[in-house]
């Protein structure tokens, strides 16, 4: 067991466990703690603690400090998969989120019970990145996008083969969601068309439209684009979809199975044709070779105002990472290269570049 003394020694900070210090009887004021904190992080947060927080119970120092806190609160749940998915726990998490708390989604893997599933506390590195990203956004003191309508699409699409199989990609939607949160933080009215992912934006003010297939993504994107001032196409839309979809599970046969594919509709090209003079259209390009040339060609061909280039050659960038390294090219052929950063920081860089094009 890790004792308070061990934590105090390693962190070189006092460790508060109870209302009264066991050494000298001094009162640990939960009110002072609540007022002093810039951010309240509860990690790990058990089902018991989450339930008490949702109910407003204050029977220990952690809970009384939470009720006294005027700062942002981040909660990192950690429990067995069945406890996490229980309706009571989900209801409690919903209550906490609706009260403005930030929920750091638990990860999946081996649990203390020996089972495998969702419920592990997010990795410490991920929690730190969430906190850093939050404070990076808090540095924005103005609302330069106030009154602007921003449409963003994000995440993958899934193209069904039969009722149990589909074609998709590794996109987590993290980059597009970070863009939506950054735009909302700058005062924009944000609509997010989101493919099938587990992540959700932090801001409660974002209008999220959930879609699954490329066809649904296209329909929702076209509709959202009609009324927006700025569009950012961050979704990883499937380039191909099965020519036919079986309504029954395809059984394993003795021979090979051939799936005929047809191209999906090009959303960026369609919106480029629809674009009005007062609209700004931003695309993304994921390249493996001749990156700048290919991205510049896509920008011109699809009538984009700006394109964000990701290279699969860059370690720590692209799908499946919480970091990204981008190059931005605008229609005047200005090229801005950025270092590897968290996706929250990258989102802020992209929005700042957009601001130079709309003002």
UniProtKB/Swiss-Prot annotation:
Temperature dependence: Optimum temperature is 35 degrees Celsius.
Family: In the N-terminal section; belongs to the HFCD (homo-oligomeric flavin containing Cys decarboxylase) superfamily.
Disulfide bridge map: none
Gene Ontology terms: biological process: coenzyme A biosynthetic process; pantothenate catabolic process
Molecular function in Gene Ontology: FMN binding; phosphopantothenate--cysteine ligase activity; phosphopantothenoylcysteine decarboxylase activity; sulfinoalanine decarboxylase activity
Activity control summary: Slightly stimulated in the presence of 1 mM Mg(2+).
pH and activity: Optimum pH is 7.0.
Biological function: Catalyzes the decarboxylation of L-cysteine to cysteamine and of 3-sulfino-L-alanine (cysteine sulfinic acid) to hypotaurine. Also catalyzes the decarboxylation of various amino acids such as L-lysine, L-glutamate, L-asparaginate and L-proline. In vitro, shows highest activity with L-cysteine as substrate.
Protein EC: 4.1.1.-, 4.1.1.29
GO CC terms of this entry: phosphopantothenoylcysteine decarboxylase complex
Name by which UniProt lists this protein: Cysteine/Cysteine sulfinic acid decarboxylase
Swiss-Prot/TrEMBL catalytic activity: L-cysteine + H(+) = cysteamine + CO2; 3-sulfino-L-alanine + H(+) = hypotaurine + CO2
Gene: undec1A
Superkingdom, taxonomy of origin: Bacteria
UniProt keyword annotations, A-Z: Decarboxylase, Lyase
